[in-house]
């Protein structure tokens, strides 16, 4: 099982109360399921049913999971997952 770091930004960070979380998992789905079990309320911010919310960006080692295998993206120890919710500004 891989030990990875999940980096949370904006309202995801506020909901969890942490910026960086170390968690174990073999693929992205497993890591995110563990994350939302530990931190109440994150699931609604990340997922719409069983898919990512349309505007959330998920990167593994700086590469969008849309360019990989989505939730089935395999992970290795030391990988970094970044979760970016929609952000607006002016």
Give the ranges of each region predicted by the language model.
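Ubiquitin-like/PB1-type beta-grasp interaction modules and other compact soluble beta-rich domains
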Residues: 1-89
């Amino acid at each position: 099982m891989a030990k990875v770091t999940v980096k949370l930004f904006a309202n995801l960070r506020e909901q969890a109360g942490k910026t960086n979380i170390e968690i174990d998992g073999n693929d992205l789905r497993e890591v995110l399921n563990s994350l939302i079990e530990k931190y109440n309320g994150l699931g609604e911010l990340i997922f719409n049913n069983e898919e990512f919310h349309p505007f959330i960006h998920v990167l593994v080692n700086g590469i969008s999971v849309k360019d990989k295998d989505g939730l089935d993206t395999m992970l290795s120890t030391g990988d970094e997952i970044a979760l970016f919710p929609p952000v607006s500004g002016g």
